[in-house]
Amino acid sequence: MISNFDCTDNQASSKVLRPPGGGSSDIFGSEMPQTPRNVKNRMASNIFAAEKDNGVKNNVRQGAHRFYFIGDAPRRGQKTVDSHNRLFGEPARPITPGKNHMKSSIPFGQNTEAVASAQKLLTTNGHYNGKSGSVSSASSSVSSSTENLKMNSGSRSVFRNMSTAAGPDTKETSQRESLCPPSPVPIEVPTPPADSLPIDNSCRDSEVGDVPADNSTYTKSDQVNEACQTRRDSGNNPELPYSLDQMAGVANVKEPLGLCPNEVKEDAQACSKLDSRNPITGLGLNGDGVGGLKPKKLKIREGNPVTGEGYKAGGNDFHHRQESNNGGTPVINKNRIPPGGYSSGLW
C-alpha cells in the first residue's frame, strides 16, 4: 500500500481549471470585443460626401423575412441578406446629377448641336443617388446658374436693342403712309345670274299701293277690318261674343252699403276661454275634452303632499284614526299615507 502512494499529490498540479463555457465566457468577466457602433451624424451634409462601399439603404421593408434587392439593408440588429453583392459585388450605377431648373434651354449665339448634347447630359429625372460625380454635378449646377444669369441679362439687352432698333422703321413707315396714301381697292358687287329667283336678290324696301275696292278684308294699306279682329277673353256681345266693335256698355256697379259677411269680426272672447292647455294631460280644455284629450280635472294642491297635512277630508280619505270608546289602545286604520305622498299618480 505504501508503494502505491503517489508522492506528487502534495505538489501543485499543472492542470488549469477552465470555467464552464470556455475562457471567453461573460460570466467570469472577460472583456467584450470592442466593435464600433454605426452612429449616424444627421447634422452632417452629404452633398460633397465620398463614396460609400455599401449600397443605398432602404429601411422601409420591415423584418428579415422580406425580400432584399440590390442596395437594400435590413433593420438594425439583423444581418444583411444581399445575395447580389455576395456573388457579383457592388453593382455599378450610372451617374445621375441633379437637374438645374434655373438654367435656360434657349441657346443665344452658341452652337446648337453642342448645346443639345449638353442638355441631354444634364437632363435627368431630377434624382441623385449619392454616388461618384456629386462634386462635379454640384459645381456644374453652380456654374450653370451663373451662366443662366449672364445669358438672361444678355438676352434682355439683345431684346432691348432690337426694340430700340425697330423704332425708327415704324416712324419712317408712318411718314411714308401719310405722304403716299394707299389706293383704295375697288369693291366689286356680285351680279346675280339670269335664272335667279326674286328671293335670291338682296332685301329692299317695297312700297304697298292702294288696295282694290273689291277687297273687303283690307280697307287701307296695312290695316285690317276691326270686325275680323276678335279676342275671346274680352267680348261680351251675345250676337258677336268675340267682337270688339259691338260691345255692351259698362255695367252700373255700385259699392255695397254694408261690409261683406266675411269681414264681420267676432266679439272678443272671454279670458276664461283662452286659457293655455297642456296637450298631454288635457289641462286647459275647460272639462270638455275636445280632440279626444283627457278632460280637465281639478286638483286641490293645498297642504303637504308627503305628510298629507292640510288636505280636506273627502270620500276617499282614510287617514283618520278610529279611537275606541272602551278606554283601550286606539285602533289605527292601516290606510295611512301612501308611498310617495298624496301627489303620487298611484293614488
Swiss-Prot record:
Start-end of Low complexity biased regions: 132-145
One matching Pfam family: JUPITER
Gene: Jupiter
Region (Disordered): 1-33, 127-193, 303-347
Bias (Polar residues) ranges: 1-14, 146-164
The UniProt record lists the keyword Protein biosynthesis: no
Biological process annotations from GO: positive regulation of microtubule polymerization
Protein name per its UniProtKB record: Microtubule-associated protein Jupiter
Function statement: Binds to all microtubule populations.
Family in the record: Belongs to the MAP Jupiter family.
UniProt modified residues of type Phosphoserine: 24, 105, 134, 145
Subcellular location per the Swiss-Prot or TrEMBL entry: Nucleus; Cytoplasm; Cytoplasm, Cytoskeleton; Cytoplasm, Cytoskeleton, Spindle
Modified residues (Phosphothreonine): 35, 96
Keywords: Cytoplasm, Cytoskeleton, Microtubule, Nucleus, Phosphoprotein
MF GO annotations: microtubule binding; structural constituent of cytoskeleton
An example Gene Ontology CC term for this record: microtubule associated complex
Keyword DNA damage: no
Ranges annotated as biased composition (Pro residues): 181-193
